[in-house]
Structure formats: structure tokens, C-alpha cells
Amino acid sequence: MAQLMNKAKNFVAEKVANVEKPKASVEDVDLKDVGRHGITYLTRICVENPYSASIPVGEIKYTLKSAGRVIVSGNIPDPGSLKGNDKTMLEPAIKVPHSALVSLIKDIGADMDIDYVLELGLVVDLPVIGNFTIPLSHKGEMKLPGLSDIF
């Protein structure tokens, strides 16, 4: 009886592991807004849903790092859902306080940019499987706004 149960568990685990899952990629990270409290960057994430039904996105977890240090991290609850058999563009905004950027002053240099790594976890609710996190990572260079951008 125990062998039969183990075979059944292995069969189900194998089928679940081979279920097609949504695919995602970071398309772009751009400066969106400069305010008194910080800078807002707009992240564009393209997600492809292989299912005919729409899939809800529970949250987007993010961590923005530079020079091996975390600049900002957080989560964006309920950013929407993924259209069935289609690509959906999600555009979460990431707010970075000025104080976090000041701590990176030695990395900025003369060209006013920061090398960064953006780590994202896109949490989708798949039928039968439950919550599934799609891990994403994007490396790039952030241009900091000049005084003319602020005033």
C-alpha cells in the first residue's frame, strides 16, 4: 500500500512540475517622477499567460540593490491580472527616497548614474498549484535627475 501511495505522489508531483507556467521579463526601467520625498522609477514587466483564463497577480515583491547594498525593497499588492492567452504589461512604480540615494554618493561618479540590480518576484495564483513566484532579475544603469529635472 505504501508503494502505491509513493507512486501516486510521484506521479502527481511530476505532472505539476511539468505544468506550463507564465513567463515574464523586465522590459525597461525608466525615471517616472522626481518629487520632494524621492524619485519614482517605472518598471515595465511583460508577462505571457499560456492559459485561456485570466490569472490574478497577488503581489509583486521587489528589491533594488546597488554596490552590494539594498537601496529599497517592498511589495506592491494586487497589481491586476494576466489576460488569457496573451501578453500583459505590468508597470509597477518603485519609489526611492533621496536619503537612500545620498548613501550611494561614492558609486554615482561624474556621469550621475548608478549601476543597479533589480530583483522581482511576481506572485501569481495558478489553479491547482496555488501561489507561484516568477523570479526576475534585471541589471542596468539609473540616471539620476539633475537640478533642471527637479525645478
UniProtKB/Swiss-Prot annotation:
Keywords: Stress response
GO CC terms in record: cytosol
Matching InterPro entries: Lea14-like, LEA_2, WHy-dom
Gene3D superfamilies hit by this protein: 2.60.40.1820
Factors inducing expression: By desiccation (leaves) and by abscisic acid (ABA) (leaves and callus).
Residue ranges crossing the lipid bilayer per the database entry: none
Listed GO biological process terms: cellular response to desiccation; cellular response to salt
Pfam families per the UniProt record, alphabetical: LEA_2
Family affiliation: Belongs to the LEA type 2 family.
PANTHER family per record: DESICCATION-RELATED PROTEIN LEA14-RELATED, PTHR31459
Name of the molecule in the record: Desiccation-related protein PCC27-45
Species per Swiss-Prot/TrEMBL record: Craterostigma plantagineum (Blue gem)
